[in-house]
Amino acid sequence: RQRQMCIRDRSLAGPFNRYSDNLVTQCVEAGTHYLDITGENIWVRDLIDKHHEAAEKKQIKIIPSCGYDSIPSDMGCFYLHRSLNQELQRIDGYHRGNGGVSGGTIESAFSMRNYKSKYSMGHPFLLNSKEYIKTQNISENRDNFKIKYIDDIKLWSAPFVMAIANTRVVRRSSEIHDK
């Protein structure tokens, strides 16, 4: 049934580490792009290990983080880099918002506690290749998510709940774009 779904383009909700492993495999085998919205980056790292080479050979895209959680950060950095035409050391983005978290997101967060992987979400370059990581200063890129007052905008700021996932997505996109 998943194979037919891959051929016809459908969607599936998370937790992605529980429901989407076979789906991504089927997409790669069928030559179908995979797009989703997950912050389960340890699972995403495992996807990269399992499928990146085959997807690249078939010229298909596996993009597991392409929703509101990641697109503003990822595309904002891309366009800022392109506009300034220089290497960027740090980008801070701010927005005002409110809302809630879906049941699927909560279930995904809890399911990651039991997900077995050799990787750690705490690594700032979790989604990058070993070759790329060798060129980066890991200690300068550690997460520093704090509530703080921002003089430039005269407001208090708290980290976005998905910041730990987004920083890794942006770093991977940067590596892929630089190739």
Each predicted region: which residue ranges?
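Rossmann-like NAD(P)-binding element
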Residues: 8-18
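Short, small-residue-biased leader/transition segments that mark boundaries at the very start
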Residues: 2-7
